Amino acid sequence: MTEFAITAYTRDGQVLSFPCSRDESLLAAAQRQDIILPSQCRNGSCGACTAQVRTGTVAANAPATDDRPLSKAAARNVLLCQATPRSALIIDLPYDHTFVRFEPVPERLAEITALDVVAPGTYHLRLSLVRDAYGCAAEFEAGQYMEILVPGTTQWRAYSLMNITNWEGCLEFVIARRPEGLFGRYLETASLGDRLRVKGPLGVFTLQENGLHPRWFIGGHTGIAPLLSMLRRMADWGEGHPVRVYFAVHDEQDLFLMDTLEDLRQRLPALEVKTCVSAPATRGAHQGNVIDTLDADLATAPVPPDCYVCGSPRLVQGVMDRVTAHGVPRERVYFERFSV
């Protein structure tokens, strides 16, 4: 079996090396060598394992979320869960070495301490980690996610954390009930005190330090969760960036946790919140498409902002296209797509 030498450079210049056969994904080959690179869906839909090929040739399935031709600048981007090598490779990873694991992701037990319906079909779930060999603290980077095992199944589901690291072991999520969703169906009958198995933290959708550039956060429905985590960390650290939030939903009744955003507005004096509702709005929300709203604001922005976007593949691609058209460098658009 032919194997090719793979050399991967993390953003902070650390080097990872592993062999990979031509019928094995780069992600699987790394894991076979106990190098666990950030990933999520493993089917090519979420984009969490995107990397860039510096030298060499790969065979790669196109991202399932976007069948348009890649621009020349993005032509070397690959999904590590889909790409297989056809030569030795040098690849660049868009995250620091600290996000690479060399041992299995911790699995822990957590107890449901609160479960509230905050909008039609949307739950606010609060868990408390059970004390174990890791202690009881919840340690993670703002913007990361956890996987939760659906009770009675072998299926894990990924949900972004909306709170920040804490000693009490608290994990908070907002979760949409979808018709085909196993975990949302479970939540309909869940009870306080139920114990769930969780795995993480995972993910590299985190705040980046680029000086005092303005930060614009764009969240589609429950995609607001990791952005709330980032905003809370900014408030805790007293960061003074000009910051703007675009909270996009279909209907006004889909807006939730507005009290949390109001609290953050009090703690972050430079924070501006824009709620964008596709359907006709009556209570002060902006009626209109979030992409068009973003477009108008970018046209008058004094400097290009750093953009953080989380939501559907369509939203992420739409934001990416629009902000880069206004001169925001692609590398300063940070995103996380919902898995499909």
Identify the function of each model-found stretch.
Residues 143, 223, 312:
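Short, conserved phosphate/pyrophosphate- and ester-handling motifs at nucleotide-, phospho-/glycolipid
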Residues 78-101, 194-196:
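Short, structured interface segments
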